[in-house]
UniProtKB/Swiss-Prot annotation:
Expressed in roots, flowers, young cotyledons and leaves. PANTHER family: MITOCHONDRIAL IMPORT RECEPTOR SUBUNIT TOM20-1-RELATED. This is Mitochondrial import receptor subunit TOM20-3. It comes from Arabidopsis thaliana. The keyword Repeat applies.
Length: 202
């Protein structure tokens, strides 16, 4: 992704975050807005250092939990919490702590599936989170933990070691791609819901 596109995405997500914050001031009981706010915080976390990203993910979880206090059956917020814990786990180098977060993610994905058993996103998330600890281990073996979020380093010239490690590298990109895709879907759904025109009362 080029720098200009990345900058445009940051501006878009920051605007959505500000809109959600303003909506919250006028209507703190809007569960959709809280879910949208949490989703955009997850998106923005990609563009920050690991410590800042973890803090933003924690803040996103707080927004999702607040949405669930208002609407306990809000399956989208439940699914988003699963995504947040998955993202947090991938940013955590300690395997025990990461596994704890993956376990939490699994619980929330299962709860979302229980609420909406036919939702393919929820089912896929539950399926993928079972593979996440292995992807996490592979990613950290390849040095993912030292790379800043939202940036991809230029590849080194091919060598026999690079060819040998291609499978491990693919696992790393599969894991991060899945996390980023899930966050993107959440933000897109939330943004789409925010811009649905309200029909006038009859």
């Amino acid at each position: 992704m080029d720098t200009e596109t990345e900058f445009d995405r940051i501006l878009l997500f920051e605007q959505i975050r500000q809109d959600a914050e303003n909506t919250y001031k006028s209507n703190p009981l809007d569960a959709d807005n809280l879910t949208r706010w949490g989703g955009v915080l997850l998106e923005l976390s990609q563009f920050h250092s690991i410590s800042d990203a973890k803090q933003m993910i924690q803040e996103a979880i707080t927004k999702f939990e607040e949405a669930l206090l208002i609407d306990p059956k809000k399956d989208e917020a439940v699914w988003c919490i699963g995504n947040a814990y998955t993202s947090f786990a991938f940013l955590t180098p300690d395997e025990t702590e990461a596994k704890h977060n993956f376990d939490l993610a699994t619980q929330f994905f299962q709860q979302a599936v229980d609420e909406q058993p036919d939702n393919t996103h929820y089912l896929k998330s539950l399926e993928m989170t079972a593979k996440a600890p292995q992807l996490h281990a592979e990613a950290y073996k390849q040095g993912l933990g030292s790379q800043p979020m939202g940036r991809v380093e230029a590849p080194a010239p091919p060598s026999s070691k690079a060819v040998k490690n291609k499978k491990s590298s693919d696992a790393k990109y599969d894991a991060m791609g899945w996390v980023i895709l899930a966050i993107g879907v959440v933000a897109w759904i939330s943004f789409a819901k925010a811009n649905v025109p309200v029909s006038p009362p009859r």
